[in-house]
Amino acid sequence: EAKKVLTEVEKECDWMFETKHTDGRTGKINYTVWSDVFICPECSKELIFWEAAVDKEAGQVLDEFPCPHCNTILNKSRMERSWVTFFDSALSETVRQAKQVPVLINYSVNNHRFEKKVDKSDLDLINTIDSTQIPQWFPSSRLMNGKETRRNDPIGLTHVHHFYTKRNLWVLANFLNKTKSLKLKILITKVAMQITKLYRFTYQSGTWGAGGGPLSGTLYIPSLVKELNILK
């Protein structure tokens, strides 16, 4: 049953994890990096955390960094978040969430791995996914009361489906809809915990993207999120 379900879901959802290589060939996304977006307190312009606060060569997140627009020296605590407002069809209401944008894609073409900055075609694909209704049912419950379970209320992540990107939520919903056996449903639950916005994008052993994972015992949402391709 597992192979049959996987084949069906891949056939229906594989398009969500495609990207264009430099020569126009289609690559399969391994993971996408999402970054927090903040507002400079001096010039009031948006800055993307990955671009402004990360030394890619040294593999470090800087404590202090210049605003890319006005050169004011900033740190995380000095900045306000940028926000997005959208209609959440699962809740039938408008929600406000801290803004995160895709900045980097790791993908494969003919079993060779590459990295690229997110381009217009990638953004268009994400916009298409975000503006399309997920055809299957998925859980959308409010997180229960508790210090940890409600820690993300201030950034607008209040219900279980908010912890997933739209495409991974879509694939999960598809898997659940097609899966009949309890054993497979338990397996899907295990996978579901590894593809949330809790997954940190980190630098380890000289490589960005190595290590990472959720911060143990917490529902901490990092400023740099590694969105894994659930179909991988």
Model-derived features with residue positions:
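Nucleic-acid modification enzymes, centered on SAM-dependent nucleic-acid methyltransferases
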Residues: 1-232
